[in-house]
Amino acid sequence: LTYKDLLYASILPSGADATQALAYSLSRSINNFVNDMNTLAKKIGMKNSNFVNVTGLDIDNHYSTVSDLLKMLQYALRNETFKTIYTTKSYTLSNGLVVDATVKKYNNLMKLDISRIIGSKTGYTNKAGLCISSIFESNNHEFIFISTNAEFIYGNYYNLKDNLNIINFMDKNYNNQTTVKSTDIIKTIPVNFSNIPKYDVHLSKDALTYLPNDYNKDDIKVNYNGKTSITFLDNNKQIGKV
């Protein structure tokens, strides 16, 4: 059994035995590992969390919030090993046993399109209900989704359905909007030492911004930061930024 096996077994199928084995191996005891968890939580700004065990099961004084979980996930995703595991749907352990991500197990029953969920971790307790954190893709952008307190009704895991509903909502209501066209005149500046008195500043290409489809164009403000005049020496050079 390897550390990699334990990491995959902890994250993909939510193996409580794997998390406890890691705790003993890395910190010599569950309590020591919990202390390490709380120390790191404070370090990364998780002000409304306190951990008592390494399994996530309900117990007195063990709690967190969705906003704190977002901080934790953003921090963890900076680690390439974690990100690789988090975005894996299925993995073969060194003993040949195959472990699947819980969303894949859910979907064996629900038969939904989960291809846009790039990575995920689910959980359940009586107090928190069905939970999920995920990275998903919409219109070539990646987003983090975290929810709690979902239900299981008639074969439907609503933490997964909620995630898919959010993806559909983003697909329909948000996209890359052309906020400034390359043909738009940003600013007109004088040209020195030339028979051409002025130059119209344009973008080199259209500016695309991810916004709601019904965004108000009057809310878009364009600021130019660059040269206030040019000469022939500036030909084919960048003269500023927008």
Annotated model-derived regions:
Residues 46-50, 61-242:
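Domain-terminus/edge residues, biased toward the C-terminal soluble/receptor-binding domains
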